[in-house]
């Protein structure tokens, strides 16, 4: 018998010991135990550290009290030395797949804090996050470690969460304190976590495959939200502001792994740029890393150009606020390992491109044509020069291309409207050399800086914030009237990757003062192409048309020419107040290619053409620019989407196939300014080129128009002056210097002289969008927009018969005949007005109790038929949808018909993303030149009905076999911003063929749709103007009382997210908010991959505006977990929910048959005779052994079970009964359930009807089991018989488990616990029987079927060895019968240990004394007790205290493994 220790122990220390004493069992299987000793401690932090001699003279105003993570030696007495570069960041934690990370944490601060990882496998007591997950005290110690206390966190790096095949060697995540996300982060509690592939780390933790690795955190600290408040907003890299980040060091030809973290407690984006360098991210070549607050990125870079290079976020406010540092690349004598030697044949393909570009000052008209459809308010604010505003014309500087170095002959006579304000397109493929002869014809210094290629310092053309004036070279700032030549070669390390488009989109601009130069107008597009992507004419080989769209925000208030513009265009310049918010706003121009409104001309394309779009975001914008393409989809990075998100100063290349006739809109999705200013219409037309074959007549004009877009060399010399495109002696010399030419191949020189004839000129112009050239040169140059057609775009559309009414069925039929393999799916959806309540609020401190939470809104609701009389009630599968409209499901090649009824009080419509539709089913209003017949869909009046018809082409669905369904959205498009904030939005799921069942649900997958949105009720149609926030509140940034961050419109408490462990769960995530609505989704305890991109592991998912993401998860940890945004302020205010993972073996009898459920817990609407409800127990015996009732007309009988706690129910077993020889049974039934006994829900399941009817019994004895899916959580269950034989009769068992999980049998009854693992103080043995401890198994049959001790006294015990640390949550006890003697234990206590030596009694939490449990009252019944808190132990003993006749025990233990 072991030694007992019952001396009082402090509760927290006891629980901590219990939680981690079993760690040794986990060490055996670990590839490596990586131990870290980390403390949270107070530190005075200076964001702008001064040199030591200066810091002694004055105390910085940028010193703040922070809490930071620091690494210590084992005894927490000596802090470990750390890299100065790490700044505020905690130590970088690293682990390979198979490792275990053990973090010994001590809190030296004055606030409770924790450590929570964004990605790792952990148990509840290593999560480091506090929320209502139903766990016990022992599992909550990690949530918030008090000051002065310690805790040990254990994280497992499993293959399931490790980097996938396509991932880099190490993935970047963050760890941070999760007690209060906003205050903890702003106080400084954050560090980096690198999860790496097996074998990728050296013994010291560094990466094997890189020369260097660096962690940089781009962050915004709001010191007013620090625990130690001091108003200040700091824009930093690793906590350093104003360029004080210590220089990042590298050697030429180093391969560097970058681990970049973005953090802010409010929504924030970062455009991370390394001047003069290119990077590779996820197998795509980039020059700017797109980063959002709360997410991380891993990228790599190979460097070759020496010098000191700027590291910055190109978001204008970040640069101005000092978020920058430097990368210092030195020549360390390393060999060039980056440049591949070329054969002579490869060398011959190298081209030298020479451009002559000038900076010139012009008067720019942002809206030369203002269509009548332009919004009046927008026009008054931005385009009119009333109220002493400047208006739409401004003096600006632009890049202009010339034919030669004389700069007297522009490549065009009149400024081409199609290009807008952009400079000429610069194109080059890998290994080409580009020379830009730049002449500054403006009145102040300018330069040219290019993105996306590696350049030397003399070709950089950029002035840094810290550059002293004496160090500004000629190339960095070209003075007025001066000329400078920028020259560089596109290196192998700059080449687009295999996954990239043929040409990737970059930009160039002046960078003397980047913000002001761009605001003045100096921008242009740059294409970096693969080595075979361009023809010798500079035209893309794999695209019919190349199209550029630059979404630029010109802040004219920051232009060099503001004073000039005020003097020239304001009616009373002397009275202008430049700091007046209205005046300032009027000068911020949202443009597409420099145009701030729609144009009367329409960009035109041929039907079936493949258009390569190059889209870029430029300017002072500090938000994402979501670009929406109507009627078509972008193919970008292997994914079809109709919204592309552009980060500031970055570009995307996308392919669009013109396959939908009509006039459509390319526009920015989001704010009023963006959607009105950043837009252009384009025509997808099916017509014959009437001028085909007339090239000779148009020869001269063709030359002129080709000149505009083809490379300068082509323009510079015609037939009489041919262009030398490739290798000449000079280029060979350059190639040799760069190591590109093999010595053995350098034996001859080659001149590939090409002459451009007129046919080629016209071909180039045609590829660039110019279909025909008529009339004079001047006329053509005034109308360069491709196919700027004035005629009716639909005149030749064979689908339209103006004499007949629109018939939706005919449209659907035509689609189906075209495809010949789809189905028609019909939906009936109405817009209805409701009162929506955002309460209950989960955290009272977040919002004032007096704040209004109930608002009038409009929502989409599904109906059963076209009468719109009977709503289609949502069931368990729809419970989580909240404010979302019904899910519209279809398979690829289907046709969707939606009959829409507007039951609201104002016009609404339906607009679908991702699907194919005619103009008559678009559901959006703009000047698309449609006939009236095609405009009826734009806005359906109140009480009106309209049928939308949408086709599902293959591009709308999953892209490969691993993807099951793809998500899109629909919403009202009358005014998308106001309509969505009013509540009118719903999901579309497009699935593979055969994935949808007869009930219109997906087969064999569990799916959820989550809509992340900050609802701004002030943007709703129904919000009273009198209640809106005042202008003063908006100016000072007061958080609106009327904004509600929520998931599916429900803050904190979204219901219905229940799933099984290890099943495939598909989450469809939507974000249709504005440009600043950025959410980073984190599922605690789980990891996931994006559908179609399973080769990449995700820990968190950035969800950008207009994003529809489908992710796949295999939940590995049972319990209730937190789903949230990593944007702290939104998380704190309600953008979070709980999801429950249930054990796949959650089908345990809940206790009707065993008697655990007592008679008093069973009730009914009535009964007949002695057939009382308490008898309704499965397999009950006796004359009266069931519940039975006589059903009377108009009565609806029921039987109810009160489980006395909320549990998970996954199945129901039913049985009838026999009365003499008569069978009594229920043939069919449905059931209802409730959590409180007041509000009852009818189970609907997969059925489309109002309730699901279950098949009952076919006789009075057979057991029928029905599976309940989805599983439900309830306390009360009622069964309602609807069909029966003779009488409604039930014997019942409910199947399920505990909500908290960890409630599966541990193996006594099943035999999983071996006989040798069950021991006792003694056991009874006679000549005819032996009552050994191994017989103490629940429900064991036989003559000797339990454990009996040798003697009956209080010193006896039964012991079970569970072999490893186990969480034990409950116990069932049972007695036994010997002959006619009934034996059972009436009371008992529990002791446990982890070392089989020092035993501890289980204590009563109320008295802190040993708890005595009530045992059995008979020999065969079951009694179940729950351990709250649970026991964490390997060994457990049951000690009988009192008994009936003799001690006899049969038991089962319930729980789960700890690790």
UniProtKB/Swiss-Prot annotation:
Region (B): 693-817
Secretion signal, residue range per the UniProt entry: 1-30
Keywords in alphabetical order: Blood coagulation, Calcium, Copper, Disulfide bond, Glycoprotein, Hemostasis, Metal-binding, Phosphoprotein, Prothrombin activator, Repeat, Secreted, Signal, Toxin, Zymogen
Region (Disordered): 739-758
Domain Plastocyanin-like: 32-196, 206-330, 351-529, 539-685, 823-991, 1000-1142
Disulfide feature: 170-196, 251-332, 503-529, 965-991, 1146-1297, 1302-1456
GO biological process, one term: blood coagulation
Site (Cleavage): 348-349, 377-380, 537-538, 771-772, 817-818, 1034-1035
Superkingdom assignment: Eukaryota
GO terms under cellular component: extracellular region; plasma membrane
Residue ranges that the Swiss-Prot or TrEMBL entry lists as coiled coil: none
Function, as annotated: Central regulator of hemostasis. It serves as a critical cofactor for the prothrombinase activity of factor Xa that results in the activation of prothrombin to thrombin.
Family the entry assigns: Belongs to the multicopper oxidase family.
Protein name, entry field: Coagulation factor V
GN (gene name): F5
């Amino acid at each position: 018998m072991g030694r007992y220790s019952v001396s009082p122990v402090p509760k927290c220390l006891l629980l901590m010991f219990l939680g981690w004493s079993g760690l040794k069992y986990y060490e055996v299987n670990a590839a490596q135990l990586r131990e870290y000793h980390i403390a949270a401690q107070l530190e005075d932090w200076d964001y702008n550290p001064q040199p030591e001699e200066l810091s002694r003279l004055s105390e910085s105003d940028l010193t703040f009290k922070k809490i930071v993570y620091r690494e210590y030696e084992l005894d927490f007495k000596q802090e470990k030395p750390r890299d100065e570069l790490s700044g505020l960041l905690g130590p970088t934690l690293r682990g390979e797949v198979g490792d275990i990370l053990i973090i010994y944490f001590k809190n030296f601060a004055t606030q409770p804090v924790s450590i929570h990882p964004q990605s790792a496998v952990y148990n509840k007591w290593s999560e480091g996050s506090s929320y209502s997950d139903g766990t016990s005290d022992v599992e909550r110690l990690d949530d918030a470690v008090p000051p002065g206390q310690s805790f040990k966190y254990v994280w497992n790096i499993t293959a399931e969460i490790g980097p996938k095949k396509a991932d880099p060697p190490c993935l970047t995540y963050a760890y941070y304190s999760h007690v209060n996300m906003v205050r903890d982060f702003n106080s400084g509690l954050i560090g980096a976590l690198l999860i790496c592939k097996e074998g990728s780390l050296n013994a010291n933790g560094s990466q094997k495959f890189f020369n260097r690795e660096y962690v940089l955190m781009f962050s915004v600290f709001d010191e007013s939200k620090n625990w130690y408040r001091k108003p200040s907003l700091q824009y930093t890299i690793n906590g350093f502001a104003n360029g004080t980040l210590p220089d990042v060091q590298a050697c030429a030809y180093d391969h560097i792994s970058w681990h970049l973290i973005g953090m802010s407690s409010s929504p924030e984006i970062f455009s991370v740029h390394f001047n003069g360098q290119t990077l590779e991210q996820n197998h795509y070549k980039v020059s700017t890393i797109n980063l959002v607050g709360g997410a991380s990125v891993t990228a790599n870079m190979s460097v070759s150009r020496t010098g000191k290079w700027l590291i910055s976020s190109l978001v204008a406010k970040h640069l101005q606020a000092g978020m920058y540092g430097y990368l210092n690349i030195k020549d360390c004598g390393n060999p060039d390992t980056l440049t591949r030697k070329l054969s002579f044949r490869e060398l011959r393909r190298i081209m030298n491109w020479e451009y002559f570009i000038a900076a010139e000052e012009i008067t720019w008209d942002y809206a030369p044509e203002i269509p009548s459809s332009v919004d009046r308010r927008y026009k008054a604010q931005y385009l009119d020069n009333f109220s002493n505003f400047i208006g739409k014309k401004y003096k600006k500087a632009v890049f202009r291309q010339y034919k030669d170095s004389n700069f007297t002959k522009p490549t065009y006579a009149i400024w081409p409207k199609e290009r807008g304000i952009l400079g000429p397109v610069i194109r080059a493929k890998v290994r080409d050399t580009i020379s830009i002869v730049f002449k500054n014809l403006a009145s102040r210094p300018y330069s040219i800086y290019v993105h996306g290629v590696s350049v030397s310092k003399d070709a950089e053309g950029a002035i840094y914030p810290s550059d002293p004036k004496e160090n500004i070279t000629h190339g960095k700032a070209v003075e007025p009237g001066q000329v400078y030549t920028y020259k560089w070669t596109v290196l192998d390390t700059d080449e687009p990757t295999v996954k990239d488009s043929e040409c990737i989109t970059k930009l160039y601009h002046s960078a003397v003062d980047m913000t002001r130069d761009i605001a003045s107008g100096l921008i242009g597009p740059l294409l970096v192409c693969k080595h075979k992507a361009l023809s010798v004419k500079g035209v893309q080989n794999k695209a019919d048309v190349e199209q550029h769209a630059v979404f630029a925000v010109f802040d004219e208030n920051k232009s060099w020419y503001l004073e000039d513009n005020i003097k020239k265009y304001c009616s009373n310049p002397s009275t202008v107040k430049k700091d007046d918010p209205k005046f300032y706003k009027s000068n911020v121009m949202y443009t597409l290619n420099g145009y701030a409104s729609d144009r009367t001309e329409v960009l035109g394309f041929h039907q079936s053409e493949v258009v390569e779009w190059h889209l870029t975001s430029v300017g002072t914008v500090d938000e994402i620019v979501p670009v929406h393409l109507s009627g078509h989809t972008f193919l970008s990075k292997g994914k079809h989407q109709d919204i592309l998100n552009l980060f500031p100063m970055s570009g995307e290349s996308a392919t669009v196939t013109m396959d939908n006739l009509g006039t459509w809109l390319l526009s920015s999705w989001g704010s009023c300014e963006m959607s009105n200013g950043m837009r252009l219409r384009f025509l997808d037309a099916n017509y014959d080129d009437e001028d085909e074959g007339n090239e000779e007549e148009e020869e001269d004009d063709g030359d002129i128009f080709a000149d505009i877009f083809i490379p300068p060399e082509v323009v510079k010399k015609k037939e009489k002056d041919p262009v030398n495109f490739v290798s000449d002696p000079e280029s060979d010399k350059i190639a040799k210097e760069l190591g590109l030419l093999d010595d053995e191949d350098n034996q001859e020189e080659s001149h590939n002289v090409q002459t451009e004839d007129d046919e080629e000129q016209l071909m180039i112009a045609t590829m660039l969008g110019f279909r025909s050239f008529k009339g004079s040169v001047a006329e053509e140059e005034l109308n360069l927009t491709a196919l700027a057609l004035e005629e009716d775009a639909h005149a030749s559309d064979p689908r339209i018969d103006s004499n007949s009414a629109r018939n939706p069925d005919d449209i659907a039929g035509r689609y189906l005949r075209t495809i010949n393999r789809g189905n028609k799916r019909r939906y009936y959806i109405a817009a209805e007005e409701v009162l929506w309540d955002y309460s209950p609020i989960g955290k009272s401190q977040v919002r004032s109790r007096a704040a209004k939470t109930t608002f009038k809104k409009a929502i989409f609701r599904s109906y059963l038929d076209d009468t719109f009389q009977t709503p289609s009630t949502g069931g368990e599968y729809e419970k989580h949808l909240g404010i979302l409209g019904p899910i519209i499901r279809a398979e690829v090649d289907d046709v969707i018909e939606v009959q829409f009824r507007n039951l609201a009080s104002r016009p609404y419509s339906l607009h679908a993303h991702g699907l194919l539709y005619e103009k008559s089913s678009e559901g959006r209003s703009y000047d698309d030149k449609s006939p009236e017949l095609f405009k009826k869909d734009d806005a359906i009046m109140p009480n009106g009905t309209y049928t939308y018809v949408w086709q599902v082409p293959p591009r709308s669905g999953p892209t490969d076999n691993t993807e099951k369904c793809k998500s899109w959205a629909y919403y009202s498009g009358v005014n998308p911003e106001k309509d969505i904030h009013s509540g009118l939005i719903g999901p579309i799921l497009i699935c593979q063929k055969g994935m949808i069942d007869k009930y219109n649900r997906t087969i064999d997958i569990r799916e959820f749709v989550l809509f992340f949105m900050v609802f701004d009720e002030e943007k709703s149609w129904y919000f009273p103007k009198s209640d809106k926030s005042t202008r003063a509140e908006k100016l000072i940034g007061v958080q609106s009382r009327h904004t509600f961050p929520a998931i599916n419109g429900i803050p904190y408490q979204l219901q219905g997210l229940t799933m099984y462990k290890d099943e495939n769960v598909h989450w469809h995530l939507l974000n249709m908010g504005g440009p600043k609505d950025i959410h980073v989704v984190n599922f605690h305890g789980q990891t996931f991959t994006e559908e179609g991109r399973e080769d990449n592991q995700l820990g968190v998912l950035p969800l950008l505006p207009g994003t529809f993401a489908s992710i796949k998860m295999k939940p590995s940890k049972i319990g209730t977990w937190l789903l949230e945004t990593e944007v702290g302020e939104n998380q704190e205010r309600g953008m979070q929910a709980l999801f429950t993972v249930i054990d796949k073996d959650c089908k345990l009898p809940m206790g009707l048959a065993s008697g655990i459920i007592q008679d008093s817990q069973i009730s009914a609407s009535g009964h007949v005779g002695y057939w009382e409800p308490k008898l309704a127990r499965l397999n009950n015996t006796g004359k009266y052994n069931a519940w039975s009732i006589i059903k009377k007309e108009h009565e609806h009988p029921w039987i109810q079970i009160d489980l006395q706690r909320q549990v998970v129910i996954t199945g129901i077993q039913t049985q009838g009964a026999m009365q003499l020889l008569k069978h009594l049974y229920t043939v069919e039934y449905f059931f209802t359930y409730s959590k409180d006994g007041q509000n009852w829900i009818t189970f609907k399941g997969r059925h489309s009807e109002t309730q699901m009817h279950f098949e009952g019994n076919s006789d009075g004895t057979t057991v029928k089991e029905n599976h309940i899916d989805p599983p439900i959580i309830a306390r009360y269950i009622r069964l309602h018989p609807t069909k029966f034989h003779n009488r409604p009769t039930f014997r019942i068992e409910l199947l399920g488990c505990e909500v908290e999980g960890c409630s599966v049998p541990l193996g006594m009854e099943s035999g999983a616990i071996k006989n040798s693992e069950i021991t006792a103080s003694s056991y009874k043995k006679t000549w005819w029987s032996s009552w050994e401890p191994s017989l103490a198994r629940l429900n064991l049959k036989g003559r000797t079927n339990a454990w009996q001790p040798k003697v009956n006294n209080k010193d006896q015990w039964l012991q079970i060895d569970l072999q490893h640390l186990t969480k034990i949550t409950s116990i069932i006890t049972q007695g036994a019968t010997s002959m006619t003697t009934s034996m059972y234990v009436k009371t008992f206590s529990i002791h446990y240990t982890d070392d089989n030596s020092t035993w501890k009694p289980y204590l009563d939490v109320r008295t802190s004394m040993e708890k005595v449990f009530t045992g059995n009252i008979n020999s065969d019944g079951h009694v179940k007790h729950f351990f709250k808190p649970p026991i964490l132990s390997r060994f457990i003993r049951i000690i009988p205290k009192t008994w009936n006749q003799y001690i006899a025990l049969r038991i089962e233990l319930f729980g789960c493994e700890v690790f």
